[in-house]
Curated annotation (Swiss-Prot):
Native source organism of the sequence: Thermobispora bispora (strain ATCC 19993 / DSM 43833 / CBS 139.67 / JCM 10125 / KCTC 9307 / NBRC 14880 / R51)
Lineage: Bacteria, Bacillati, Actinomycetota, Actinomycetes, Streptosporangiales
UniProt protein name: D-inositol 3-phosphate glycosyltransferase
TM region positions: none
Assembly description: Homodimer.
Pfam short name (any one): Glycos_transf_1
Length: 428
């Protein structure tokens, strides 16, 4: 008779530097926030409770907030509430860990079956909590310093040595490493020497209930966009890594080559400054003025998901020119709404976008090459329509429920591995 599999009842999810309650597209909030929220909700629907530990960023935040039945967000005091740069967070990890351990100590031993940490800072906390509680650590990198440093944008700062070391330590101690794509798995193995047997690929997903096709004309009316405009859309945090400047420069070239485009082209950017982009919050506005296209550029603040879905539907193309992406949720959201994507052929975007079927992948970051690719697509409505249909089919393969179900399997496998290797009484 086969042994009964151990059940995972509750997961401690650690997200030190960004709260799942924050609006994606501003500050440090981005795709990782979406990932944590969507996965937590669906794990809870599977009967696995999730408690998310994140740093308190305002004095008036309650100790805990129920995000969804079975999902609790716990605010941990560690350092000043506001104006703490991410570069200063390593100095607050001991305080954060202390808060996590104090929370666990309020309950009977064994409250958490698994720890899932997100980003290297959280991995450091997860490492020590794993040692204290005797439970497995599952870690998702989301981005990796060595990869980012290999593909730096012009003017961007390299990731510091402390992060590289911290990531190497987390890779060494994690029981399972979750990679978003096969590409990321290969980078973990080749750059960080992760044992292949501890690396599992689990694709992120998209909320197919929110991001779904709907009439373009109605979306444009709601957003105040002309019905006959040609709309290029960028969604994301405004920082060198995301390369929104490439889209603006490409648009300027398109207008210079075809002046009649100026009266119809709209270049929309939805998002706020983040990371190294905070040094110049007016970067895109200044660049648009410098390029002489301020009249066609529309800068919008980060939008909640229902409004964001309208932006995708209203666009002819979503442009994702990032220097690197571990996956690229923006690309997937756009495709789920039926809008093809022109994306840089880097990292996880090669998985998120199916070249020639749901969009196109562009090599390099030369604005002239991007201008040619964008113009070619805008000039071919039949091809755009075919890519739109392909985008919906492609995105339908990436529901969050499938992501959560696979993660639940990873948690169970990690739990069974720990119980096979830890001697009886070792944690008593």
């Amino acid at each position: 008779m086969a042994a009964r599999r151990r059940r995972v009842n509750r997961v401690a999810t650690i997200s030190v530097h960004t709260s799942p309650l924050d609006q994606p597209g501003t500050g440090d909030a981005g795709g990782m926030n979406v990932y944590i929220v969507e996965v937590a909700r669906r794990l809870a629907d599977l009967g696995i409770e999730v408690e998310i530990f994140t740093r308190r960023t305002a004095r008036d935040l309650p100790p805990a907030v129920e995000l969804h039945p079975g999902v609790l967000v716990r605010h941990v005091t560690a350092g000043p509430y506001e104006e703490l740069d991410r570069a200063d967070l390593p100095g607050q990890l001991c305080s954060f860990l202390s808060g996590v351990l104090r929370t666990e100590a309020m309950y009977e031993p064994g409250r958490y079956d698994v720890i899932h940490s997100h980003y290297w800072l959280s991995g450091q906390v997860g490492w020590l909590a794993k040692e204290r509680w005797g439970v497995p650590l599952v870690h998702t990198m989301h981005t990796m310093a060595k990869v980012k440093n290999l593909r730096l944008a012009e003017g961007d700062k390299p990731e510091p040595a402390i992060r590289v070391l911290g990531e190497e330590q987390v890779v060494d101690v994690a029981d399972r490493l979750v990679a978003n794509t096969v590409t990321e798995a290969r980078e973990l193995i080749e750059l960080y020497h992760a044992p292949p047997e501890r690396v599992t690929v689990v694709n992120p997903g998209v909320n197919l209930n929110i991001f779904r096709p709907a009439p373009k004309a109605a979306a444009r009316r709601r957003l105040g966009l002309p019905a006959d405009a040609r709309v290029l859309l960028f969604v994301g945090r405004i920082q060198p890594l995301k390369a929104p400047d490439v889209m603006l420069r490409a648009a300027a070239i398109m207008i210079a080559e075809r002046p009649e485009l100026r009266s119809r082209l709209i270049v929309a950017c939805v998002g706020g400054p983040s990371g190294n982009g905070l040094a110049r919050p007016s970067l895109l506005a200044d660049l648009a003025a410098e390029l002489g296209i301020a009249d066609v550029v529309r800068l919008e603040p980060p939008a909640p998901q229902p409004e964001l879905a309208d932006w995708y539907r209203a666009a002819d193309l979503t442009v994702v020119p990032s220097h690197n992406e571990s996956f690229g949720l923006v690309a997937l959201e756009s495709q789920a709404c039926g809008t093809p994507v022109a994306a840089a052929s880097v990292g996880g975007l090669r998985t998120a976008v199916r070249h020639g079927v749901s969009g196109v992948l562009v090599d390099g970051h030369d604005p002239r090459q991007w201008a040619a690719s964008l113009a070619e697509l805008l000039d071919d409505p039949d091809r755009l329509a075919a890519l739109s249909a392909g985008a919906v089919r492609h995105a339908a393969r990436f529901g969050w429920s499938a992501t959560a179900a696979r993660l639940a399997e990873v948690y169970t496998e990690a739990l069974e591995r720990v119980h096979r290797t830890v001697p009886v009484g070792a944690n008593s």
